[in-house]
Amino acid sequence: MLILTRRVGETLMIGDEVTVTVLGVKGNQVRIGVNAPKEVSVHREEIYMRIQAEKGNGNVASGNY
């Protein structure tokens, strides 16, 4: 795992097309903004896991959360 330190307003790049920007820090919560092409799905981990579980049950999940 790569560990990076960023301050509010700073950005990191993932590949050539995905950016992650630290928008704010309040206590133990960090607000981030993700800018990615439409074909790249971006989900919180718990939502991603639910989508994967639904796929395993034959259900179709759509949309970003």
Swiss-Prot record:
One of its GO terms (cellular component) is cytosol. One of its GO terms (biological process) is regulation of carbohydrate metabolic process. Its main location: cytoplasm. One of its GO terms (molecular function) is mRNA 5'-UTR binding. Pfam families: CsrA. It is found in: Cytoplasm. Keywords: Activator, Cytoplasm, Repressor, RNA-binding, Translation regulation. The keyword Cytoplasm applies. Belongs to the CsrA/RsmA family. Homodimer; the beta-strands of each monomer intercalate to form a hydrophobic core, while the alpha-helices form wings that extend away from the core. HAMAP family: CsrA. A key translational regulator that binds mRNA to regulate translation initiation and/or mRNA stability. Mediates global changes in gene expression, shifting from rapid growth to stress survival by linking envelope stress, the stringent response and the catabolite repression systems. Usually binds in the 5'-UTR; binding at or near the Shine-Dalgarno sequence prevents ribosome-binding, repressing translation, binding elsewhere in the 5'-UTR can activate translation and/or stabilize the mRNA. Its function is antagonized by small RNA(s). This is Translational regulator CsrA. It comes from Vibrio campbellii (strain ATCC BAA-1116).
